[in-house]
């Protein structure tokens, strides 16, 4: 899968090699379900640093780990970005040793907790460039009472 920005920053071009097709996802559709999963198109798309603001709330032990995390609140920079993503904010637990998000709470446009993310089995996938990725992800949609599990993440 390859995701790129379209001519409008709010549009995304999605290429799925299995189907050999490019699909354009317009800005307002990016908060909709990604192929029936609990992920939205905006969840799997590349984000830009200027699309949101972040502030460190505190430092604490990462959920389910012994390592230290920063707890960071991320909010969309504009109402347009807020509507596009479908989130009013997220709170993310980011490991201090490798900057990988290992947990996250995502809030809907009314401020209600909507999704919970847990990422485990974090491994260094590219030692030369010091890139780390989780190899097991659980995303839970609390409003639909549905979870997505992935343990086949490849780099």
What kind of region is each of these model predictions?
Residues 1-17:
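N-terminal mature ectodomain segment of secretory-pathway/periplasmic proteins
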Residues 2, 11, 23-25, 32-47, ...:
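Gly/Pro-enriched, hydrophobic low-complexity segments
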Residues 6, 64-66:
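Solvent-exposed loop and beta-edge segments used for protein-protein assembly and interaction
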Residues 16, 26, 58:
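Residues at the C-termini of beta-strands that transition into short coil/loop
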Residues 20:
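Phosphate/NTP-binding elements of NTP-utilizing enzymes
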Residues 44-59:
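A short, amphipathic edge element
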Residues 55-63, 120-125:
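Short amphipathic beta-strand and strand-loop transition segments with alternating hydrophobic
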């Amino acid at each position: 899968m390859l995701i790129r920005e379209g001519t409008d920053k709010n549009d995304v071009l999605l290429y799925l090699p299995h189907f050999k097709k490019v699909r354009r996802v317009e800005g307002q559709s990016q908060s909709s379900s990604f192929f029936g999963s609990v992920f939205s198109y905006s969840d799997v798309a590349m984000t830009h640093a200027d699309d949101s603001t972040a502030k460190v709330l505190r430092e604490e032990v990462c959920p389910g780990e012994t390592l230290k995390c920063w707890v960071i609140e991320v909010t969309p920079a504009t109402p347009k970005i807020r509507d596009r993503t479908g989130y009013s904010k997220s709170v993310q637990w980011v490991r201090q040793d490798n900057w990988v998000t290992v947990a996250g709470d995502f809030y809907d446009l009314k401020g209600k907790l909507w999704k919970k993310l847990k990422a485990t089995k974090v491994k260094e996938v590219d030692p030369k460039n010091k890139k780390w990725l989780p190899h097991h992800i659980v995303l839970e949609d609390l409003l639909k009472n549905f979870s997505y599990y992935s343990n086949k993440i490849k780099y």
